[in-house]
C-alpha cells in the first residue's frame, strides 16, 4: 500500500503543538532546531505567552517546523510517503518531505514568507476568515453586500 501525506496550511496551529514530540524524539528536535530565526521558535510554538502564534510571521515558520519534525519522526520509523501535497503553506512542508528542501531551508523560507506577508499587510486595516459549510452563491452574495464597507473578496476555495 502506498502512503500519501497532506500537510496543513496556516490555521491548524495551537499553543503547545509539537512540545511532546520535541521532548521525546531526537529526530523531531533535530529538524525543529535546524533553522536560525530571529525569534524563539520554542517559546512561540510551545508556550505562546505573548499570543503571537496566530500572527502570520510566527505561524508560518512554526507550522513548517512542526511538520518537518513530524516528517523526521516518520522517516526515523521507516515511514516514507509515496506522495506528498500541501495546502498553501503546507506546500513547503511537502517539498521538505519530498527532499526538495532541507528542514532548515523550508523553515527559513516559511519565516521569510510569513514576514513578507505581514509586511505587505502592515498599516492596512485587513483580515481574513475561513467560512465553513456555506455554498458559494450565498457566500458571494454576503461578500457583495459587505463590499459597501470596503474591499471584501473571496480569496480561494479549499
Range-by-range predicted roles:
Residues 67, 82, 86-90, 94, ...:
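Gly/Ala-rich beta-loop-alpha elbow adjacent to hydrolase catalytic centers
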Residues 30, 62, 88-89, 101, ...:
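An amphipathic alpha-helix/helix-turn recognition signal
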Residues 63, 70, 94-96, 116:
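Hydrophobic side chains within alpha-helical segments
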Residues 10-12, 37-42, 98-158:
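Alpha/beta catalytic cores of group-transfer enzymes, especially the acyltransferase/condensing modules
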Residues 47-51, 85-89, 114, 126-130:
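Short, glycine/charge-rich beta-strand/loop segments that flank catalytic centers
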Residues 73-77, 95-100:
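Alpha-helix C-terminal capping segments
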Residues 1-85, 134:
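Helix-rich "cap/lid" substructures immediately adjacent to catalytic or cofactor-binding pockets
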Amino acid at each position: 500500500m502506498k502512503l500519501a501525506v497532506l500537510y496543513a496550511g496556516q490555521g491548524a496551529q495551537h499553543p503547545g503543538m509539537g512540545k511532546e514530540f520535541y521532548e521525546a524524539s531526537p529526530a523531531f528536535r533535530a529538524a525543529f532546531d535546524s533553522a536560525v530565526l530571529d525569534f524563539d521558535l520554542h517559546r512561540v510554538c510551545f508556550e505562546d505567552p505573548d499570543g503571537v502564534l496566530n500572527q502570520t510571521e510566527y505561524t508560518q515558520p512554526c507550522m513548517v517546523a512542526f511538520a518537518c519534525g513530524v516528517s523526521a519522526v516518520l522517516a526515523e520509523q521507516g515511514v516514507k510517503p509515496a506522495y506528498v501535497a500541501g495546502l498553501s503553506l503546507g506546500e513547503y512542508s511537502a517539498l521538505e518531505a519530498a527532499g526538495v528542501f532541507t528542514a532548515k531551508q523550508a523553515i527559513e523560507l516559511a519565516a521569510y514568507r510569513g514576514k513578507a506577508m505581514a509586511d505587505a499587510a502592515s498599516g492596512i486595516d485587513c483580515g481574513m476568515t475561513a467560512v465553513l459549510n456555506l455554498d458559494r452563491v450565498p457566500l458571494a452574495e454576503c461578500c457583495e453586500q459587505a463590499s459597501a464597507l470596503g474591499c471584501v473578496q473571496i480569496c480561494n476555495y479549499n
